From Swiss-Prot:
GO molecular function: cytokine receptor activity; interleukin-1, type I, activating receptor activity; NAD+ nucleosidase activity, cyclic ADP-ribose generating
Positions on the Cytoplasmic side per record topology: 360-574
Family in the record: Belongs to the interleukin-1 receptor family.
Catalytic-site annotation from UniProt: 470
Organism: Mus musculus (Mouse)
Any Pfam family the entry gives: Ig_2
Protein name: Interleukin-1 receptor-like 2
Length: 574
């Protein structure tokens, strides 16, 4: 029973969601009365719902089938528009525009009434003022005013050949009237200028031509001067940065009283924009739109630059609204040096970081390559005879010191002396018999460029540093008297240096240490292995010339490739 109840509740909840999602909020209804035989559009807009990602569909009630999107049909939906090409008497009815987004649904209704009525037809009763689709407009007496031909169609429709009529006669340009596209300028308005006007235009859609007629009933009225000064909220005599060759649209926003009929237009060099650029049509004035407020009307007249040219820079384009005027000036954009500077700085920092990363990763190989590429066979004139003094722990007889002796007395000379051409002083191998230990060490340590110290983790292995004069004199001369660079090599990983003499602790802290990998194979005796590269990196950048008695032709270095060390001739340059 419980499962059935839960299932029923779930189905009921989903049903509620479905009904809520399918319910649309009615916004308002438009009543439109218009004559048959001409194109008619209606744009479904409900800001901000139609500004984002929405699904908009037109219907004719009571049908649930949407209006077709096929542009070749007489009645079809074109984006947010419903378009009749042309109207017929059968088109009368109620049309619904349904707007859906991710969260809401709205619908706008249009009550369309199509009447049989024709301009200047003998069957027409009365004047055009009685026409159902007439527009009411006002002209100010004693001033200049303008009439607007309302032509709002989707982008798929092209409009041209706009003509103006008073009564049934076409208006020609003269002192009284100045037709300018969708706008008719009336100079020095008088009472007799009121009456019936009309504008017509040719509409082209997918190669088909239609004629549009708008009927305008004009009243003349005297308006108090104090109330008729319009307010231009934008532009504000400002400049606009715009790149050369770009497209620009600028709106002129005007707030005016409802009874005001001031002329609203764009001018350049005291000439209407459409007249000034009538040949190229590169710059055009747009169609005026308006929004009614309580006691005012907000007008918008835009100017479109299809392609900005050099001649447009520095030239004022002025928006006029009666006695009010405001201009814009196009200026060439100033290069944003901050962006270039920031980009250059970021690139430089990235380069520095990359170079430092590469250097830290490959500095040993880079330094060894540099020494090899730019080495000299001449010995440095520093009065030194040895490249390094080797100091290593001496184990008592019977202890496990064989590996240390093998490394120091066999492998070390094999690699550094025979393969790389260095000269080492190893006490117990290079001193002359019978010499006093103190004098031997004191004399030879002065002739060395480096001090190479081997340490082991056993605390006892370096206990001799506290007692034997060799170690004491070597470390003293290296750190105090001669400022020698010390190479510290760990025979095994030393975790705790606290048991070591303070001199060794100081060397470890200042110079770091190189750890021997404990490999005594043939491959480990190659100067190109990782361990010996580190040792060579800390050794002096030199080798003895071939004529030196230290270097023998019989010395054969190794060549390490694919994990093997093969014999080769010549010396490896450190």
């Amino acid at each position: 029973m419980g499962v059935t109840s839960l299932l029923f509740c779930g189905v009921f909840f989903l049903l509620l969601l479905f009904v809520a999602a399918d319910t649309c909020e009615d916004i308002f209804m438009h009543n439109v009365i218009i004559s048959e035989g001409q194109p008619f559009p209606f744009n479904c807009t409900y800001p901000p719902e139609t500004n984002g990602a929405v699904n908009l569909t037109w219907y004719k009630t009571p049908s649930k089938s949407p209006v077709s999107n096929n542009r070749h049909l007489r009645v079809h939906q074109d984006q947010t528009w419903i378009l009749f090409l042309p109207l017929t008497l059968e088109d009368s009815g109620i049309y619904q525009c349904v707007i859906r987004n991710a969260h809401n649904c709205y619908q706008i209704a249009v009550n369309l009434t199509v009447l049989k009525n024709h301009w200047c037809d003998s069957s027409m009763e009365g004047s055009p003022v009685n026409s159902p689709d007439v527009y009411q407009q006002i002209l100010p007496i004693g001033k200049s005013g303008s009439l607007n031909c309302h032509l709002y169609f989707p982008e798929s429709c092209a409009l041209d050949s706009i003509k103006w009529y008073k009564g049934c006669e076409e208006i020609k340009a003269g002192k009284k009237y100045s037709p300018s596209g969708a706008k008719l300028l009336v100079n020095n308005v008088a009472v007799e200028d009121g009456g019936s006007y009309a504008c017509s235009a040719r509409l082209t859609h997918l190669g088909r031509h239609f004629t549009i007629r708008n009927y305008i009933a004009v009243n003349t009225k005297e308006v108090e001067y104090g109330r008729r000064i319009p307010n231009i909220t934008y532009p504000k005599n400002n400049s606009i940065e715009v790149p050369l060759g770009s497209t620009l649209i600028v709106n002129c926003n005007i707030t005016d009283t409802k009874e005001n009929t001031n002329l609203r237009c764009w001018r350049v060099n005291n000439t209407l924009v459409d007249d000034y650029y009538k040949d190229s049509k590169r710059i055009q004035e747009g169609i005026e739109t308006n929004v009614s407020l309580r006691d005012q009307i907000r007008y918008t007249v835009n100017i479109t630059f299809l392609k900005v040219k050099m001649e447009d820079y520095g030239r004022p384009f002025t928006c006029h609204a009666g006695v009010s005027a405001a201009y814009i000036i196009l200026i060439y954009p100033v290069p944003d040096f901050r962006a270039y500077l920031l980009g250059g700085l970021m690139a430089f920092l990235l380069l520095v970081v990359s170079v430092l990363f590469i250097y830290n990763s490959f500095k040993i190989d880079i330094m060894l390559w540099y020494r090899s590429a730019f080495h000299t066979a001449q010995a440095p004139d520093d009065e030194k005879l040895y490249d390094a003094y080797v100091l290593y722990p001496k184990y008592p007889r019977g202890s496990q010191g064989h590996d240390v002796d093998t490394l120091v007395l066999k492998i070390l000379p094999e690699v550094l002396e025979k393969q790389c051409g260095y000269k080492l002083f190893i006490f117990g191998r290079d001193e002359f018999p019978g010499q006093a230990v103190a004098s031997v060490i004191d004399e030879n340590i002065k002739l060395c460029r480096r001090l190479m110290v081997f340490v082991a983790p056993e605390s006892s292995s370096f206990g001799f540093l506290k007692n034997l004069s060799e170690e004491q004199i070597a470390v003293y001369n290296a750190l105090i008297q001669h400022g020698m660079k010390v190479i510290l090599i760990e025979l095994e990983k030393v975790k705790d240096y606290s048991t070591m003499p303070e001199s060794i602790q100081y060397i470890r802290q200042k110079h770091g240490a190189i750890q021997w990998d404990g490999d005594f194979t043939e491959q480990s005796q190659c100067a190109k292995t990782k361990f010996w590269k580190k040792v060579r990196y800390h050794m002096p950048p030199r080798r003895y010339p071939a004529s030196s008695p230290v270097q023998l032709l019989g010395h054969i270095p190794c060549n390490c490739k694919a994990g093997k060390c093969n014999a080769a001739t010549g010396l490896i340059t450190p």
